[in-house]
Amino acid sequence: MVTTLPQAFYSNFLGNAPSWYKKAICLFLLINPVIFLISPYIAGWVLILEFIFTLAMALKCYPLQPGGLLAIEAVLIGMVSPHTVYEEVSGNLEVILLLVFMVAGIYFMKELLLHLFTKILLSIRSKAILSLLFSLVAAVLSAFLDALTVTAVIISVAVGFYSVYHKVASGKHFHHDHDHGDDESVHHDHRADLEQFRSFLRSLLMHAAVGTALGGVCTQVGEPQNLLIAQRLGWDFIEFFVRMAPISIPVLIAGLITCVILEKTRWFGYGDDIPASVRKILEDFNEAEKKKMTLQHESKLITQAIVALILVVALALHLAEVGLIGLTVIILATAFCGVIEEHQIGKAFEEALPFTSLLVVFFAVVGVIHEQHLFTGIINYVLGLEKSVQPGMFFIANGVLSMISDNVFVATVYIDEVRTAFNDGLIDRAHYEALAVAINTGTNLPSVATPNGQAAFLFLLTSAIAPLIRLSYGKMVWMALPYTLVMGGLGYVMIVITI
């Protein structure tokens, strides 16, 4: 019961977040300036740990507000300058445009995606084969498109499946409006199946998310840092693929085998199949969609298919920056499907903009890492080692740092340091290329360990589907652990053997 104005202020602070969480954030805000006065370096590492804490507690409170408060304080006390934050943001404008426009573009293709993936889900009975297909498709698409785009597609499909079942489990029909975030209306006899369905969707999403990393490491356009490294080394699409293949292909195969093993053994939270009642509801939904298919609805699906084809070709050929291609998708899909009202278009941006804001906060933390030189000691240590062991150590160092920070930032820092060493004549071209391979694979493969390692994983953690299927930070780390060990371990072995 709020009886005083201070109590009202405290109650409003971070809303419905637990009291202990509010107190923890207040404590962070109080101690950070003190630690910064004692040691800016230690304060920088403390800030990173605090930010990771806000990500880990994403289901308690969306990380934008607590993380944003920490970032604002970091600017105010001088841990990072506003200009550095701006530089980090402007340097990642491509990613921001991607999030704003591409994710919204996918929203306007959700009818087609739900139509296609419903058929796939209902036609494949084996969970292991279905999981393998999701992982493989995500890997192939990520090799030519973008991991965030692929993740957005998978999330859109999962939300579609979940909302259809949740609506029926709550006693409503397919055409009714429904809040699928509220479990109060779910009938008692559906609750056990709902939990199993959540586990089913969690495993599919994690297989697909890891698949984006397995495919993303292979090609020049797979991840933002790949393009950066290719530009530094002067590699084209084919040469980049050939350089990475001795490491990326064995890891891809091992990752797909791991997918099947996890489903068969039911380890690490995998293995739950789709409940029979859920399958029946999705089958009924599919039949209902067929019956109400009009020429106008059919024309929309055809339009979305054509737009999807344009999207794939434009991304594969890199005809423009990804975000601008996303804006093109929005314009084409809405214009030819008759979506012309502002509030209809606005719904598409609801999913992406909170995460885009969070990513800008993340860039502020990356700016702290940059200004306080938090990674410099590790970089200098690795560069000071014997040349024969440097590739393996670069792989490990990049992997560990990418678990903490953004892998694009880590790759940028390392490749620039290595390029400086090459330009200064400290290393030859062959060693420069070997280290570039180690940096690329190191930032792409072990970084699946934590959601903050890869933007696609962070996007999944903070997306609308995560709280619905109870996918927390800790759950993601646990479910990614076997993949981390396989991909990181085999990647290191292949680096040592082949380079």
Curated annotation (Swiss-Prot):
A Gene Ontology cellular-component term:
plasma membrane
Q: Which UniProt keywords apply?
A: Antiport, Cell inner membrane, Cell membrane, Ion transport, Membrane, Sodium, Sodium transport, Transmembrane, Transmembrane helix, Transport
Reactions catalysed, as given in the entry: 2 Na(+)(in) + 3 H(+)(out) = 2 Na(+)(out) + 3 H(+)(in)
The highest taxon in the source lineage is Bacteria
The record, for Pfam families, names:
NhaB
Query: What topology does it adopt in the membrane?
Result: Multi-pass membrane protein
Locations listed in the record: Cell inner membrane
Residues crossing the lipid bilayer are: 33-53, 66-86, 89-109, 128-148, 237-257, 305-325, 326-346, 349-369, 393-413, 449-469, 477-497
Query: What coarse category fits the chief subcellular location reported for this protein?
Result: membrane
- The reply on keyword Membrane is yes
- GO function terms (MF aspect): sodium:proton antiporter activity
Q: Which cysteines are joined by disulfide bonds?
A: none
The record's listing under InterPro entries reads:
Na+/H+_antiporter_NhaB
The Swiss-Prot or TrEMBL record describes its family as follows: Belongs to the NhaB Na(+)/H(+) (TC 2.A.34) antiporter family.
Output the PANTHER family linked to this UniProt entry: NA(+)_H(+) ANTIPORTER NHAB, TRANSPORTER ARSB-RELATED
Q: What does this protein do?
A: Na(+)/H(+) antiporter that extrudes sodium in exchange for external protons.
What name goes with this protein?
A: Na(+)/H(+) antiporter NhaB
